[in-house]
From Swiss-Prot:
Cited function: Part of the twin-arginine translocation (Tat) system that transports large folded proteins containing a characteristic twin-arginine motif in their signal peptide across membranes. TatA could form the protein-conducting channel of the Tat system.
Membrane topology value: Single-pass membrane protein
Subcellular localization(s) per the UniProt record: Cell inner membrane
Protein name in the entry: Sec-independent protein translocase protein TatA
GO molecular function, one term: protein transmembrane transporter activity
Chain coiled-coil ranges: none
GO cellular component terms given for this protein: TAT protein transport complex
InterPro entries: TatA/B/E, TatA/E
Location of region: Disordered: 56-86
Organism of origin: Prochlorococcus marinus (strain MIT 9215)
Family of the protein in this entry: Belongs to the TatA/E family.
The protein's assembly and partners: Forms a complex with TatC.
Gene it is expressed from: tatA
Length: 86
């Protein structure tokens, strides 16, 4: 078991110290608060990643739409040029 670079012996020592410092009555409350904090951090991280992905997708699509618009304009100019020759 290796969570955040902390192995099982280290986790055991941390839990024993927490038990000694906070006592058995406050540990469930602290665990609950820690869980809520980790959940909100994960949610914020996911939202941030989604925003980055959205911006990257917009940047990827922008050159395609510009190229498409330019191609359409060139084709329209060719058609107009051919029509004016007739």
């Amino acid at each position: 078991m290796n969570i955040f670079g902390v192995g099982l012996p280290e986790v055991t020592v941390i839990l024993i110290l927490a038990l000694l410092i906070f006592g058995p009555k406050k540990l469930p409350e602290l665990g609950k608060q820690l869980g809520k904090t980790l959940k909100s951090l994960k949610k914020a991280s996911n939202e941030f990643q989604n925003e980055i992905d959205q911006v990257m997708n917009e940047e990827d699509e922008s050159p395609k739409s510009i190229e498409s618009n330019q191609t359409n304009e060139i084709n329209q100019e060719k058609i107009d040029s051919e029509n004016s020759k007739k």
